[in-house]
Amino acid sequence: MQNEPLTPGYHGFPARDSQGNQEPTTTPDAMVQPFTTIPFPPPPQNGIPTEYGVPHTQDYAGQTGEHNLTLYGSTQAHGEQSSNSPSTQNGSLTTEGGAQTDGQQSQTQSSENSESKSTPKRLHVSNIPFRFRDPDLRQMFGQFGKILDVEIIFNERGSKGFGFVTFENSADADRAREKLHGTVVEGRKIEVNNATARVMTNKKMVTPYANGWKLSPVVGAVYGPELYAASSFQADVSLGNDAAVPLSGRGGINTYIPLISLPLVPGFPYPTAATTAAAFRGAHLRGRGRTVYGAVRAVPPTAIPAYPGVVYQDGFYGADLYGGYAAYRYAQPATATAATAAAAAAAAYSDGYGRVYTADPYHALAPAASYGVGAVASLYRGGYSRFAPY
């Protein structure tokens, strides 16, 4: 009664061998011993070929089938079922191992494909020869891969000595950077680096007035200093130092600009309000304060024997307005007439660099309010500008 459940199992093993099973008869010792010698399968790693993964899965699968047979096989039915289990388990585990390695290979191939189809990369090339043009730069970098775009930066004087090369593949761009960085081309050591995006700031123009004015009174005082020097207009003297200049804005809107309160220099021939404001009106609204300033400064004022040296001793406007006075005001006698002083002022009327303005047609006595944009631009591009870089 004690061993009756196990008796069919023990008698069933020889019968199973007689059916053609090739597996050896297992003993209780064989049931326990193989577990201590079975190595644990290594974890899956990317890039391991199929031959490394399949043999381990086969050995482990076969041993697993034997132990499943001895441990859980108690009847003939279980024995028959387990007799077919090693092959099925071997096949299933082999297919799983093959699928796993195939998945790993496909994963590595997909990663390589994605790497080869990466985003374009832009290189910054500096210190290139000035005679280089886009085809020259494309020929120099074209040996490393497909180039999408080549651009050399120019200004009005020619090449600035640097440019950009955009590769379709970032790997080609890195290889070109490693090979060409530091090489000498026509005596110049070129530098190839990864291009970085420039941070662009949007500068918005501030419009301080609701009627569309873009030139503030402070800037207007720079371009038309005669208008803002003081409350010096003959028509506004009766109003005191807090006078205002009425200027017609857009749409017929009158705008009053308060004048800067400065003390009047006695005896100085300030321009009248009618002529100066008439020349200033309209041109100021169109941003042409420079032309009005040139029209006002072209008229040499009358000579003053005791001219006070307190007005506009600045290096820029002082040289244009009053540069001539310093040359002759001390040399003239106290009884000098207005005609001789005006002639001396016209002869010495220069900007301090030896260039006389009398020969310039834009500095004539004609009103300058009707000049076009081209003429205004020519004033800035003239030979007398001290701020021209070259």
Curated annotation (Swiss-Prot):
Modified residues (Asymmetric dimethylarginine): R297, R329, R381, R386
Domain RRM: 121-197
Residues with the Omega-N-methylarginine modification: R281, R381, R386
GO molecular function: DNA-binding transcription factor binding; mRNA binding; RNA binding; transcription corepressor activity
Keywords linked to the UniProt accession: Cytoplasm, Methylation, mRNA processing, mRNA splicing, Nucleus, Phosphoprotein, RNA-binding
Family annotation (PROSITE patterns): RRM
UniProt xrefs under SUPFAM superfamilies: RNA-binding domain, RBD
Keyword Magnesium attributed: no
Subcellular location(s) of the protein: Nucleus; Cytoplasm
UniProt key word Nucleotide-binding: no
Top-level division of the source organism's lineage: Eukaryota
Classification via Pfam families: Fox-1_C, RRM_1
Annotated site, Interaction with RNA, chain positions: R122, F130, R131, N155, K160, F164, R188, R198
Region entry Disordered, spans: 1-127
Polar residues composition bias: residue spans: 18-28, 65-95
Ranges of biased composition (kind: Low complexity): 97-117
GO biological process: estrogen receptor signaling pathway; mRNA processing; negative regulation of DNA-templated transcription; nervous system development; regulation of alternative mRNA splicing, via spliceosome; regulation of cell population proliferation; RNA metabolic process; RNA splicing
Protein name as annotated: RNA binding protein fox-1 homolog 2
Native source species: Homo sapiens (Human)
Gene that produces this protein: RBFOX2
